[in-house]
Amino acid sequence: MGFEILHEDARTQARLGRLTTAHGVVDTPVFMEVGTLGTVKALEPRDLVETKAQVVLGTTYHLMLRPGPEVLAAAGGLHRFMRWDGPILTDSGGFQVFSLAKMRKFTEEGCRFNSHLDGHEFFLGPKESMAMQKVIGSDIAMVFDECLPYPCDRDRAESSVARTIRWAQVSKGQPHAEGQQVFGIVQGGVYDDLRRRCAEELVKIGFDGYAIGGVSVGEPEECMYQAVDASVPYLPKDKPRYVMGLGVMHQMAECVARGVDMFDCVIPTRIARHGTAITRKGNVAIKAAKWIYDQGPVEEGCECYCCRNFTRSYVRHLLACDEILGLRLLTIHNVHALNRFMADLRESIRADAFGDFLAQVRSYRN
């Protein structure tokens, strides 16, 4: 198991890679589907295979609350529970504790909080997070960190970085599932020197890969790129780099140009549930009246199950009637669209044409 760089772009930091996990090989750069509660919303595992999904992301916080560690242990882990044979990455639960949970109380050991579901009290820290991820049996586990909001003042960012580093050290020392890789998470907000400090300290601890956290939390796009630029130079070249919570096509392409290999986001499934289709040339509101009589596919040239078999008119009809099939078809399309985009991106790196690919992506955005 490990990460191998197969080819590098001559004009940018984009690289083509291969990440080997206990449940299979992942071609990078990769977009990972979010399956918060052990399911990518509206999709079956066979849909994920057909849409060329490579990795599913599970959320430790949500899985800890329900179904809980006892149920997952009885099932033999999340792979068996959800019948997904491919790689699974789990986040640590830190983001959800800081963004969803109520009545938070911090200590050096972690965070005591009340569930957003029923108010029941829980405690989650680096030891508890890694123990839960061991039960889940994910191929890649993330260290427990403190995810900062935007904006955030320097004093809080500095104390958060120190805590994130301490928690990373504790996380690294916990028992892991067999074959489980562990990634560190760089924090530091918009402060370049803090991100450098965090990255360098995490590298000293030593991890199988490194994530750039605290981005895509409401900051301007230029601040997101600044955070990536402030982190990547201090991360090992021979380890995968992962920007958390990012799933917009042009933003992923820009980050790949900066040397990033992995991404995840709820965008493709979430906007599908609101009637929006992802296409190479931009998002399309399928609920719009202009598609009432349109007999073309959701996206011309798309080979997903939805576009091969159904029209914009029909999908719009389903959405207008609140039929579950409409959400499912549009989710299939959106997940396929992002995975196709990443496959095309990888091929452009392989063919030494990433610069042209990036220029085309930028032209669609503009």
What does each model-identified segment do?
Residues 1-176, 289-292:
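Non-catalytic, usually N-terminal nucleic-acid engagement modules in DNA/RNA processing proteins
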Residues 1-18, 26-30, 42, 145-151, ...:
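C-terminal extensions of enzymes
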Residues 24, 56, 91, 133, ...:
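Conserved, mostly hydrophobic/aromatic
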Residues 128, 132-136, 159, 163-170, ...:
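A non-catalytic, amphipathic alpha-helix used as a structural packing/dimerization or gating element
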Residues 137, 168, 172-175, 206, ...:
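Structural signal for hydrophobic packing residues in well-ordered secondary-structure cores
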Residues 150-151, 158, 209-215, 324-327:
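Glycine- and acidic
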Residues 162-165, 174-298:
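Glycine-rich phosphate/ribose-binding loops and adjacent secondary-structure elements
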